[in-house]
């Protein structure tokens, strides 16, 4: 978990880890390999998947179609595992609630072959109870699939679900 106030650099770090931005100096290593040398497109496709605060779903598709874009084999089962019903799986994503859309985004990230999931404020648009449920779901499902999940949040409650917390505060990073 990466925890800190707005503007503390949490999302910048996630952008660097995801290959969405390049460092001005130094390098980012994954399993000892510089991600810039892997080819960023290949890195983003094979090594990391994303869960964004705004869900980043294809709006004219159903949840099933959104997940099939990542892995044609992982459809209904994955969507059921994140708590969606058969009816919800086949609806247009715009007809789903924010919590349901976030579950679709999580299912899509979990379906990716990538071993790392980067989640930027994945519960920022959700009420407290739904945020707790979605965080637990993401962390538990990622663990069961042997994936590493890195969640950026400003919420102590969300961060409590993590094994390790990096706290960004006043230009310093502490590990808890």
Predicted ranges, named:
Residues 18:
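Helix-to-loop junction immediately C-terminal to a conserved catalytic motif
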Residues 78, 82-94:
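Conserved ABC nucleotide-binding domain
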Residues 92-96, 100-102:
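Conserved ABC ATPase signature
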Residues 106:
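Hydrophobic anchor residue at the start of the ABC signature
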Residues 26-34:
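Conserved ABC transporter NBD signature motif
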Residues 35-49:
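ABC ATPase NBD coupling module
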Residues 117-120:
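Catalytic Walker B motif of ABC-type/P-loop ATPase nucleotide-binding domains
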């Amino acid at each position: 978990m990466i925890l800190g106030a707005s503007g503390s650099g949490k999302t910048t770090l996630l952008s660097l880890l995801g290959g969405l931005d390049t460092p001005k100096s130094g390098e980012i290593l994954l399993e000892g390999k510089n991600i810039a040398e892997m080819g960023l497109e290949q890195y983003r496709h094979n090594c990391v998947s994303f869960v964004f605060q705004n869900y980043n779903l294809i709006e004219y598709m159903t949840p099933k179609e959104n997940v099939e874009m990542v892995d044609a084999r992982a459809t209904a089962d994955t969507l059921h595992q994140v708590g969606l019903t058969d009816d919800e799986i086949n609806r247009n994503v715009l007809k789903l609630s924010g919590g349901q859309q976030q579950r679709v985004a999580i299912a899509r990230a979990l379906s990716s072959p990538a071993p790392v999931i980067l989640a930027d404020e994945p519960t920022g648009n959700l009420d407290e109870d739904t945020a707790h449920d979605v965080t637990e779901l993401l962390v538990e499902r990622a663990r069961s699939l042997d994936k590493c999940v890195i969640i950026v949040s400003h919420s102590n409650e969300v961060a409590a679900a993590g094994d390790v917390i990096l706290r960004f505060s006043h230009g310093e990073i502490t590990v808890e």
